[in-house]
Amino acid sequence: MGRMVKIFILLKDKPGALKEVVDELASLSANIVEVVHDRLSSNVRAGTTGVTLSLETEDQKHMDKLIQHLKDKDIDFKVLT
């Protein structure tokens, strides 16, 4: 088992938005362990949806690469754990 990381991503509430993020994660071989989709929390603005992803990565280096890739793609996210 690799290193686990949980991230919260704020997406535009439109068809295909989650797929775009999942495709980016897949391109770096991140294993998605859990997905929680939330439109109702107070921290989710109108027209957006919050998604919490639990990911398995190979090691710390792989996790750092994944986080940098999301930043480079201007994906609105924060690391929770």
Locate predicted features.
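A conserved regulatory-domain signal marking ACT and ACT-like small-molecule sensing domains
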Residues: 1-81
